[in-house]
């Protein structure tokens, strides 16, 4: 940028823009010089023009020309122009008039390098720099005065600008500078146009963009050895600008003694550059050099440390081959910012170790498998007593609280399993095939049919408890007698008591066994024998087989009777009440230990409600076992009674089914319809439009804001070639026309007189 500085003393310089004529005069002009009588109204004219376009990006200075139009003259370096024009150079002294209007001509270099700008920003920047008399270059050199970036990123140009102490500004700085020159106001400062730092690994506060003289000699005394020509070409200029020495080590050179010096930094090839290495010998040679460095407790310097050393102005932490990177600050900070993004999609809490999370998921699968296995327990008759005891115990532990789902507390479940293992039970691992069955839907038809009886067993638990307690008040007994109870509910309550007693019997983990069941069960007499035998497997297997056979008999009875038990007649109600009274009488006769022990029964009920999940004492287990034996006996009696009274079952009942009626429209594309519509013509095709989503809407038209204007990049060489070609064609046309005129010339022209 050209400017005229007053030579007499301090004063505001007058800056000149390219392509503008500045008139120097006393009145009504751009460059006013007042209080001087020797200055004319239009004393001189100053013009700044661009030089001829060159293909190279060498620094070209605009031409400043002065033309004298004054009365008393204009002097350049003491010589008078006398109305002529002259080009000025930096340092010339110009005197307007004969008095003290003296100025010094100076040229302020303006070479700008841009980085990470789009096409529109580059175009606006070129126009502003050309008006200011500067030059825009693509690569950083020593002559560069500014680096233009929209946001600061650590690039080679950024490192070079920091080393040279040049300001890094935004593109808006030069537009504001041009406005200030045109209006002759205070120029903007580069500090107010610093771009934002776009490096999360470094941080905004840690990066100082101001000029520091110590950066110019940051690499003094150090030698950087590059193993590839690409790295040497890219980072070599930055090292040289910082006062260091950049060398390229050839593959043929085998001596590595120069690499073990503490002032020699071997630049690491890196992951991306190692993929470019072509030959196997090149990779082996690089690995051998790195092995030599490791053997001498040295390390290779990554490319990023060259930039970090310039930014933080330290070669003790960065670019130091003797310092082992024990705390990778930049890498750790980068990883800490990338890590939460990937961990947000995880459903496992990060505070839980992976092993703990895996164990937790395994426990959930195990609980689901236990629930499915125990639901199918009623239709299975297994010979492995120990395994059935374990599964039944886990079912009891899960179902003891009705509001608890399948995923109960895993710790309590494991503790119960561990406790029961001390009683001599054998833990069998679940097979993978059973675990896979958890994901299958439970709406299978065979399983619904087999488990249909289990749906009734969970309903009558409260009634069962009410019937087992003989301490029920007279008012409750009267209400129960007045309320009709079908035969199915009695059978369900007895069967549910058998099922619950079987669960409690095998789930508590002791070896209490029923001694035997004589044939006197039908005559309301049962001998209960509680023993602690060491080998109870044969008797227990026999009892379980008997119970399973009874349950299968119940299922056959329910399946053979497709009746609606909720709509019973008066005869059914009377039979239910009589069965209920007989059952209570049988319970009163059969329970030997429960007679006279009402207080103990109340205490057992309190313990059962309060101590859920705890190991019951031996006395409680024996009482529960006695209750379960009574329930089994009642179930068998009711079953026999049901077989005896099968002839008295109600008949002539009405079966009600609810069906939803749906009006179905006839198909329009049937053959008969087509024949009638088309007047009986064969092979006549009818077509119709198939609706699709969005058929009634307007189509989406790409246009407007969706289109981006294509900005073609101007090619100066092509334009110049086209211009020269056009001039050449015009010249040839003129020559041809001149030749034609000479050919038609006739010296003997006859003129008419």
UniProtKB/Swiss-Prot annotation:
One of its GO terms (biological process) is DNA double-strand break processing. CDD domains: BRCT_nibrin, FHA_NBN. It holds the Pfam family Nbs1_C. Residues 22-81 form the FHA domain. GO terms for molecular function: chromatin-protein adaptor activity; damaged DNA binding; DNA-binding transcription factor binding; phosphorylation-dependent protein binding; protein serine/threonine kinase activator activity. A motif (FxF/Y motif) lies at residues 739-748. It comes from the Eukaryota. Residues 517-528, 585-606 have a biased composition (Basic and acidic residues). Signal peptide: none annotated. Residues 101-191, 221-311 form the BRCT domain. Residues 442-606 are annotated as: Disordered. The modification Phosphoserine is found at residues 274, 343. It is found in: Nucleus; Chromosome; Nucleus, PML body; Chromosome, Telomere. Its main location: nucleus. SMART domains: BRCT, FHA, Nbs1_C. Keywords: Cell cycle, Chromosome, DNA damage, DNA repair, Meiosis, Nucleus, Phosphoprotein, Telomere. Transmembrane segments: none annotated. Residues 446-455, 490-500, 568-577 have a biased composition (Polar residues). GO terms for cellular component: chromosome, telomeric region; Mre11 complex; nuclear inclusion body; nucleoplasm; PML body; site of double-strand break. A motif (Nuclear localization signal) lies at residues 461-467. Component of the MRN complex, which plays a central role in double-strand break (DSB) repair, DNA recombination, maintenance of telomere integrity and meiosis. The MRN complex is involved in the repair of DNA double-strand breaks (DSBs) via homologous recombination (HR), an error-free mechanism which primarily occurs during S and G2 phases. The complex (1) mediates the end resection of damaged DNA, which generates proper single-stranded DNA, a key initial steps in HR, and is (2) required for the recruitment of other repair factors and efficient activation of ATM and ATR upon DNA damage. Component of the MRN complex composed of two heterodimers RAD50 and mre11 associated with a single NBN. Belongs to the Nibrin family. The FHA and BRCT domains specifically recognize and bind phosphorylated proteins. The C-terminal domain contains a MRE11-binding site, and this interaction is required for the nuclear localization of the MRN complex. This is Nibrin. It comes from Gallus gallus (Chicken).
